[in-house]
């Protein structure tokens, strides 16, 4: 995917304006499958998200009664929202197709799998969430990944040093 940055520091990827990312997710989990889903928001939450005041790092999604909910995602209250602001850690419904929800129900019943948010972005003026079906990494897996990245960096350094 081609990443384009504008003057204001906004990041665009394939027609999407990325508002927030979960950087810890790819370090702590093996990503099996990703889903794009809509999110049910109140008016002041949308304004706050557009300002980039979102924290996805502690968030997760769960399936309850054939509905998917996003939990522990912190959206800061909108400064000019006064009485219209809602709880910053409230549970938010995710909008998916029925067949996708059925797949997620089957997958999350397997031990070790969970649903985590990867990014929050604007697509055609709508706020979308990219969630992933993920399996937690063990400590030795994290060390192995860091060793691979370190070796790759060394190789690149050597290649640029020779030419």
From Swiss-Prot:
Primary location class: cytoplasm
Keyword set, alphabetical order: Cytoplasm, RNA-binding
Q: Which GO terms describe its cellular component?
A: cytosol
Q: Which Pfam families match?
A: SmpB (PF01668)
Q: Which InterPro entries match?
A: SmpB (IPR023620), SsrA-bd_prot (IPR000037), SsrA-bd_prot_CS (IPR020081)
One GO MF annotation is:
RNA binding
Subcellular localization is given as: Cytoplasm
GO BP of this protein: trans-translation
- Indicate the family of this protein: Belongs to the SmpB family.
Enumerate the HAMAP family for this protein: SmpB
Q: Sum up the protein's function in the record's words.
A: Required for rescue of stalled ribosomes mediated by trans-translation. Binds to transfer-messenger RNA (tmRNA), required for stable association of tmRNA with ribosomes. tmRNA and SmpB together mimic tRNA shape, replacing the anticodon stem-loop with SmpB. tmRNA is encoded by the ssrA gene; the 2 termini fold to resemble tRNA(Ala) and it encodes a 'tag peptide', a short internal open reading frame. During trans-translation Ala-aminoacylated tmRNA acts like a tRNA, entering the A-site of stalled ribosomes, displacing the stalled mRNA.
The name under which this protein is listed is SsrA-binding protein
What species does this protein belong to? Clostridioides difficile (strain 630)
């Amino acid at each position: 995917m081609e990443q384009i940055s504008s003057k204001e520091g906004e990041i665009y990827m394939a027609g999407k304006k990325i508002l927030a990312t979960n950087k810890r997710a790819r370090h702590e989990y093996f990503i099996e499958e990703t889903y794009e889903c809509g999110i049910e928001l109140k008016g002041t939450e949308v304004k706050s998200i557009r300002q980039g005041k979102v924290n996805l790092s502690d968030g997760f999604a769960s399936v309850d009664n054939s509905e998917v909910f996003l939990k522990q995602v912190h959206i800061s209250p909108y400064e000019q929202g006064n009485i219209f602001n809602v709880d910053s850690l409230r549970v938010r419904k995710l909008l998916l197709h029925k067949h996708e929800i059925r797949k997620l129900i089957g997958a999350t019943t397997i031990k070790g799998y969970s649903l985590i948010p990867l990014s929050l972005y604007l697509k055609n003026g709508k706020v979308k969430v990219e969630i992933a079906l993920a399996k937690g990494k063990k400590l030795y897996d994290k060390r192995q990944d860091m060793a691979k990245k370190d070796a790759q960096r060394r190789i690149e350094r050597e290649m640029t040093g020779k030419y």
